[in-house]
């Protein structure tokens, strides 16, 4: 992939997504155009049903837009066939979910290397060295032979992050990664993600409802009614994020009452 210093790692152009369950059309995204900067942590927030999860799914190629285009670097992924899109996700995109999604019968080491198994190959020497670096930085060296049920929630999520980073993805998507963790483990996970951006140049898009989690971001995008409503790029704090969310909720309530 070719990207310059200012080239977005991912971008949407005039993207809409309409779901049509049983003939009742629901617009989840409406004409969204958005650039995601490389080597930054971008948080996406919004009220329930605002479209933030759909935005992430479309960006990650997990869902196709009804209209518009999605690019990963210079490649338009909306044109890809399903099998090519699956291969792209496996090789160039990392995922971290709230529920960890570890394979219970595999050890930590096997879970981390799972993306290579799914790609029907073994990691090369430089990839093994990278995995060792990630394992060390995430403090998992003494847990490699353990299975998920022998780990704490924080250790399970660290394993999931290591798995997501193992292939050195162009971009990592995290959906409520601290949602199942206690406050201490949540802080540790967000510190790891911040370090991945700062030390490894990793690009991360994070969906969360928690202002404390979002405050780790370099940029916070607020989604309302299927479109970006506003964003924060400077002076990002839990208080500023909570205040912005309150303003969005109040505007929505005012619109409904008219």
Please place each PLM-identified region on the residue numbering.
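Conserved ABC ATPase signature
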Residues: 147-157
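Catalytic Walker B motif of ABC-type/P-loop ATPase nucleotide-binding domains
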Residues: 172-175
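Short coil-to-helix segment of the ABC ATPase nucleotide-binding domain corresponding to the Q-loop/switch region
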Residues: 106-115
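Conserved catalytic motifs of ABC-family nucleotide-binding domains
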Residues: 168
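Conserved ABC ATPase "signature" region
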Residues: 75-76, 120, 124-142
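Conserved ABC transporter NBD signature motif
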Residues: 68-76
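Helix-to-loop junction immediately C-terminal to a conserved catalytic motif
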Residues: 60
